[in-house]
């Protein structure tokens, strides 16, 4: 089983990782710095997301140090590139704790990276806030675990709940669904949730397959789905797969009534630039969009700072997917340190579990299993994208409509899919 397999990896996996220390903005604080260690995907398929998260974290670090640090000490981030390779993760966290002897650790990005860290974290008894990772703690049930992903108390179905709710509300209601997923931890979890949502709404599953993560040709998969003739298609995929799926669907002129769901990558500017109008009609999850009702105290100031530095840092120019969340999840740890006046993992975990935190993405409260007490997962539809669309298009809301949840809804779905093409 995936989660158990990674417990056997050791420090040797770090050999290929790259250590980097973020600069400190303040030097006036006394004492040794408080060190916070983590792995982040800075190369490999998830680098476009990992790099923007890192910049968000570095901005937090600089802001904290400019105000005097924490507990009268400066803060220093200590991080390794996990290369989007789960096998590096146990070794990285072992080295951070046993060799680098960091004061605290924080989680990596993505389910496939967070899960293999858990045995090390649990053995060491460390508080562990991860960035995005779907249902990572479902089997471990570790009481010091917290997830910044807004998937809520029932994480697996949350990624596609809005997708299925939207489909079920159409008249006539679609009857059949195809489910397709990469054979990887996140995609399998999301697709398990999609099955739950399909059953909830009485959809008949006519296609349910997984494909190898190394797949590059998605035309045969799309043809197989076409042959099953589903009304709607839910896809659970990672970035390069998502791009390949969108291209294959358009190249084959496939037009189900609704398509999308849990496709990682479509949120990133680099992939939106690549796909442009091919995205029209797709319905997919987002975790934050620049809508007025999702702008909180500090949101605009953060993104102004992030975007002014993005080009020099070689990261996503907008940072909407993970830049803000990178800032938010480490700010929770920082606020807990300040409130408890402590670096004790037990005290920090107890405080985090009981407290509602104010972040640049709004107030966040954790519930059972360290998941959000209430889901904040969005489903949006892309539409009206013209050839040559670029960053000024992606900067705003004209090309996307929030369909769910109701408190963030900005419009209604264009249905069926071909009407938005």
Which residues fall in each region the model found?
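Hydrophobic alpha-helical segments within soluble ligand-binding/sensing domains
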Residues: 89, 149-173, 217-219, 242, ...
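Solvent-exposed, acidic/polar segments of extracytosolic/periplasmic ligand-binding ectodomains
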Residues: 34, 353-421
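Short, low-complexity disordered leader/linker segments with a strong preference
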Residues: 1-35, 415-421
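Extracytoplasmic "Venus flytrap"
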Residues: 33-58, 80-87, 109-110, 180-189, ...
